[in-house]
Design a protein with these regions (language model features):
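Boundary-flanking segments of nucleic-acid-binding domains in nuclear regulatory proteins
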Residues: 1-260
Length: 260
């Protein structure tokens, strides 16, 4: 646990903490519309105070945009996005989201800017995107889950083979722009494009259920396949799912409801 220190000489917007190991950290923060916003930790007091002053400048100057941000190296890019969205749209998100009229952008880096439908706003405002190799993940169900799984893509999907971005932008995950070419066994996008339907072919297609994510639908299909394989001595193929741990898979498998 870190212990806060009160220091009258510390510049405004900066406070000092010490870790249990005795390391000194300089944290910066700013207040906007009665909301206290952390700007992160810095190696020294000067850098922390500069981050605070830069944050104030961003909040008070509507002419400063993300395109101008190369001039403000003192403030972390993620924090700049959060502050500009709060300034321009009056809404605070803990992730680097900037709202547009009928979609939103998630600014991972200045070069990597995702575009999502508004219906995905709640999810990505509470799930931080990370990059590992050439793939993008969020922490969900206690594991790293590919962001593509939310849109019906298999883990480690390859553009051109498993999906196609219609406008050519590989970061534009709006459903109107994403054509899924290869998905999980027994999983299709719902007609309203707000979730996923799991189904299995018996004498015809039998609906297993409606699910918010493709991952849940794929696990529901596996559960239905297991039941039918045992009950009717069938040999339905199963989805190979390696994006969550065995423990998490079992938790979802055991709790998921089927409409069979």
């Amino acid at each position: 646990m870190s212990k806060s220190e009160n220091n009258a000489k510390t510049p405004k917007g900066v406070y000092i903490t010490r870790t249990a190991a005795g390391k000194t950290l300089y944290r910066a923060s700013v207040t906007k519309a009665s909301r206290h916003i952390s700007l992160g930790s810095y190696p020294d007091e000067k850098k922390a105070h500069k981050a605070y002053l830069t944050a104030l400048k961003v909040l008070e100057n509507n002419s400063i945009s993300l395109d101008d941000f190369q001039d403000f190296k003192a403030l972390k890019y993620e924090k700049a996005v959060i502050l500009m969205n709060l300034r321009d749209n009056g809404i605070y998100f803990g992730t680097p989201i900037y709202l547009r009229k009928d979609y939103f952008n998630y600014h991972l880096t200045p070069e990597i800017v995702f575009t999502f439908d508004l219906e995905d706003l709640f999810y990505f405002s509470s799930h931080k995107i990370s990059k590992r190799g050439g793939h993008f993940f969020v922490a969900d169900y206690g594991s790293q889950v590919s962001i593509g799984s939310r849109f019906g893509l298999k883990p480690y999907s390859v553009e051109g083979r498993d999906c196609r971005f219609i406008n050519g932008d590989p970061y534009d995950y709006r459903r109107s722009n994403l054509e899924v070419l290869n998905t999980y066994h027994g999983v299709i996008v719902s007609p309203d494009q707000k979730g996923y339907i799991a189904r299995i072919h018996t004498s015809g297609y039998t609906k297993i259920g409606f699910y918010e994510s493709a991952l849940e639908a794929a696990i529901a299909y596996n559960k239905a396949a297991d039941i039918l394989n045992k009950k009717e001595n069938k040999n339905y193929p199963e989805n190979y799912i390696d994006e969550v741990s065995g423990k998490v898979y079992a938790e979802i498998y055991n709790s998921i409801k089927l409409d069979l």
